[in-house]
């Protein structure tokens, strides 16, 4: 007879947000890109955790903080299959269904080094386009279009 030992690899939180099923190697980037660390609340990160769905995944838990639907939808660009769960008293009280936003403002950096958004005191602004499973972003200022991964790695 075989026994299975199930153990949480990342400690449960009493109240807050759990972002699960983030593609492996993306969790850290999401933390900085979306300024999820701009809090004094405890943040627990699991990187390269085993996942039945995708082999490996990242996980982020932020205590006493709830993401808005807009914030959660911005994550969909880089973690389309992620789940964003609201936790209260150690229970999932709400699951946010992610959908791509039409725009993303003041989060990403334009990869075009000649774009005025680098030198002027303006917030970045991108229109999100999805076609045949490919996601691209069009900068409001230089009007150039980029693959979403190019924008992810632009710093």
UniProtKB/Swiss-Prot annotation:
SUPFAM superfamilies: Aspartate carbamoyltransferase, Regulatory-chain, C-terminal domain, Aspartate carbamoyltransferase, Regulatory-chain, N-terminal domain. Keywords: Metal-binding, Pyrimidine biosynthesis, Zinc. The keyword Glycosyltransferase does not apply. It comes from the Bacteria. Its cofactor is Zn(2+). Gene3D superfamilies: Aspartate carbamoyltransferase regulatory subunit, C-terminal domain, Aspartate carbamoyltransferase regulatory subunit, N-terminal domain. Involved in allosteric regulation of aspartate carbamoyltransferase. PANTHER family: ASPARTATE CARBAMOYLTRANSFERASE REGULATORY CHAIN. Belongs to the PyrI family. Contains catalytic and regulatory chains. This is Aspartate carbamoyltransferase regulatory chain. The gene is pyrI.
